[in-house]
Amino acid sequence: MTNLTPSLEDYLETIYLLQQGSNEARVRDIATARAVKASSVSPALKRLSDLGYLTYIQRESIRLTESGKIAARRIYARHVLLFQFFNDILGMPAEKAREEACGLEHALSDEGMDRFVQFFESRSLLSEPATNSSQDPQNPCASCPAHKTIPHTTLDKIADGHPVVVAQIRAKGAKRQTILDMGIIPNITLIRTASTHDGIRVNLNNHELFLSNEQVHSIVVIAHHTH
């Protein structure tokens, strides 16, 4: 995606988020979300249209093309990972974490993204440590908190309609990166919506994705539970 500047990536991401639950976004909605004048939105939309990332007719709604959706999901996945790290791990306030993620998401390489994913994967199947009040002078570790592995399974074993939280991606190399770039990363919620002979459809951020059988078998999930 070398033909996309950080600014154009931001526009794609904004449109993608506006289209959650809808297939449309309007110029004034984009301008409001980006805190810019409507007159500055049109040139960016025209450029994205020329590059094949969206369809745009003046005064009408904007729709992302398939390549536009792929590009938007890729950049948004990086944003979510970075936000999780700054907010959940480092304890940065949400608004500040969001600003940091917005600034860094454009520069995060595939390798950098994968390292963040590995970090969250290493945490995702561990429950909170259970405190052990016993003190054994012969075995100092007896009082150390012990983590328990959370029950998990792969996405192919989940019934349609059930929400799950992604824990790990077991695919390797380019196949793994393809899944990550779809936005399927640790701690996000998926809902399996339908099955076909060659894969399944899932709902992610109110957008529908198709996953092949091979991809489905490589996605480790935890059953979603509400509090």
Where are these regions (language model features)?
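N-terminal helix-turn-helix DNA-binding core of bacterial DNA-binding proteins
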Residues: T2-V36
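Alpha-helical residues within the helix-turn-helix
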Residues: T32, S49-D50, D88
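The short coil/loop that forms the "turn" connecting the two helices of the helix-turn-helix
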Residues: A35-V36, R59, M92
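Key DNA-contact positions within bacterial/archaeal DNA-binding proteins
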Residues: S39, E95
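A short, conserved structural fragment
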Residues: S49-I57
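Basic, amphipathic "hinge/linker" alpha-helix immediately C-terminal to the N-terminal HTH DNA-binding motif
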Residues: E60-H79
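C-terminal regulatory/oligomerization modules of transcriptional regulators
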Residues: E105-V164, Q168-G173, G199-N203, H207-H227
